[in-house]
A protein has these predicted regions:
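Short glycine-/acidic-enriched loop or helix-start segments at secondary-structure transitions
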Residues: 1, 26-28, 99
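A short glycine-rich, Lys/Arg-flanked "PGG" loop and its adjoining helix->strand segment in the class I
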Residues: 1-14
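Basic side chains
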Residues: 7-10, 71, 114
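Glycine-rich loops and low-complexity Gly/Arg-rich segments
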Residues: 14, 40-44, 111-115
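A short hydrophobic/small-residue beta-strand
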Residues: 15-16, 87
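SAM-dependent methyltransferase
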Residues: 17-78
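C-terminal lobe and adjacent flexible extensions of AdoMet/dcAdoMet transferase-like proteins
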Residues: 75-115
Length: 115
């Protein structure tokens, strides 16, 4: 993705990217969102792939939400840096509607400039 973005951007062009912080995917979403009294525990390895987990019978996907896939921070950030983009800003945000936000940020956004 970043190779193509870099290819079409002119020198000095900006690319803003937002993505989920990968650690969020390590927890069972049902416990995070619907069972606040249950203990949190690590359940899934990264990178997260809900389609594979469904095929293995480990989770059931609600068709209303679709499949989710995560990428490692290295894939996201290094992918930008190794494709002619320089990071000029970085932002994290929390979704206060669930308890994981007490431990870290849910969302990450980067702003890069084409070199």
């Amino acid at each position: 993705m970043y190779k193509e973005a870099s290819r079409v951007l002119k020198k000095g062009g900006l690319l803003m990217v937002g993505f989920m912080n990968p650690w969020i995917y390590m927890y069972d979403a049902d416990i995070v969102w619907d069972k606040p009294d249950e203990e949190l525990f690590l359940k899934f390895p990264l990178p997260f792939n809900s389609k594979e987990l469904e095929e293995e019978g480990k989770i059931t996907i609600n068709p209303e939400y679709g499949y989710e896939f995560s990428h490692t921070l290295e894939t996201q950030i290094r992918g930008q840096l190794k494709n002619g983009l320089a990071m000029i800003d970085f932002y994290e945000s929390c979704d206060k509607r669930h308890r994981l936000s007490h431990y870290g940020s849910d969302y990450i956004a980067t702003l890069c400039i084409k070199l």
